[in-house]
Amino acid sequence: MLELSDIKFRYPKGEYFQFSYKFDLLTPVVIQGASGSGKSTLLNIIAGLISPSSGYLRFEDKNLLKISPSERPLSVLFQSGNLFDHISCLRNVEIGLNMRSRINSEEKFIIEEVFQNLGISDHKNVLPTEISGGQRKRIALARAIVRAKCLGKKLMLLDEPFNGLDFETKSECINLLKDGCFKEGYKVIIVSHDNNDPTLLGANRVKLENILR
């Protein structure tokens, strides 16, 4: 379970975000809401990119607000993808594990498997600037999945992970996530504008409304 209790964050212009909720995470969660409703703010608080002024954020009996972002059990996919354009797609995924050390043989096998499952094996040695937006999105998703598999960072925060994907590719990505939830215990929270996603994922839908004051 992921529990947010009386989380408050004040924006620079004075408006503040206030939110309490218990996510059981037994199935994926899809967060939806109008533009500006606080969806990205919520993910950024969980990820530790912004700090609330009050409240607590509890996951597996730990208050994540007392844990540095790098130590939290998270695998994050940002809406922009956050890929480094000057290094290969493969290296973009590898640095999700370790910025400096070598990747071991087991990790290499997992990375290869994830690339194959996402249909991006042909793009391992090219730069992100040389592939399409949908392919870039799959590289970013691969990095999140590899972190979950190799580092045990199984709370996955995915911001619009299916943007730019055709229906067939999207279905493959969804099936891979569902399989990970069932077999490996991923806990998945997705921000999505697509009203079909909760049904496709078999997910609980949480709509953000009236949480900005």
Where do the model's predicted regions map?
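ABC ATPase NBD coupling module
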Residues: 63-76, 80
